[in-house]
Amino acid sequence: MVEMGSGAWLELGKGLWFILPAYIANLSACLFGGGRPLDFGKKLSDGRRLLGDGVTIRGFIVGVLAGAVVGLGEGLVVGDPWKAGDGFILGLGAMAGDAVGSFVKRRIGLERGAPAPVLDQLDFFVGAVLLYYLVYGWHPPGWVLVGLAILTLALHWLTNVIGYLLKLKEVPW
């Protein structure tokens, strides 16, 4: 078994603190979304919806705002209220990543609720980290990102199963 020193655990904890606004944005969109689809029902030339009914205007906005609120909360804890901007960027990236994931699923012929392993779990994570990097030119160390991606896969599975059992989701993935 590989042992991680306390410094490694600290870096992983910092990474989790960093990505928390994206996690909460993704969860908030699921819990409080619904309503009008972000794509307004539009179809592309292939006859398939642009995004589908699962990506909604309300969910997108709630997700972005939730990310900003979590960022603000983190900022208040560490004495830097500008962290709200980080939370906004991470929330926006998470919602954009989720929308891109839905776009890809529609293009390959998968309907809403159809499983797309890894894509379903990491689209918001990749979107958040990518947008943060594009805006600020920074991301956690590579090994921390890999650790967070693995943690995200596990947490996503767990929260989806819980959501399914609580009848908040139609499918457990």
Swiss-Prot record:
One of its GO terms (molecular function) is CDP-2,3-bis-(O-geranylgeranyl)-sn-glycerol synthase activity. It is found in: Cell membrane. The keyword Thylakoid does not apply. Its cofactor is Mg(2+). InterPro entries: CarS, CarS_archaea. GO terms for biological process: glycerophospholipid biosynthetic process. It is an enzyme of class 2 (transferase). Pathway: Membrane lipid metabolism; glycerophospholipid metabolism. Catalyzes the formation of CDP-2,3-bis-(O-geranylgeranyl)-sn-glycerol (CDP-archaeol) from 2,3-bis-(O-geranylgeranyl)-sn-glycerol 1-phosphate (DGGGP) and CTP. This reaction is the third ether-bond-formation step in the biosynthesis of archaeal membrane lipids. This is CDP-archaeol synthase. It comes from Methanopyrus kandleri (strain AV19 / DSM 6324 / JCM 9639 / NBRC 100938). The gene is carS.
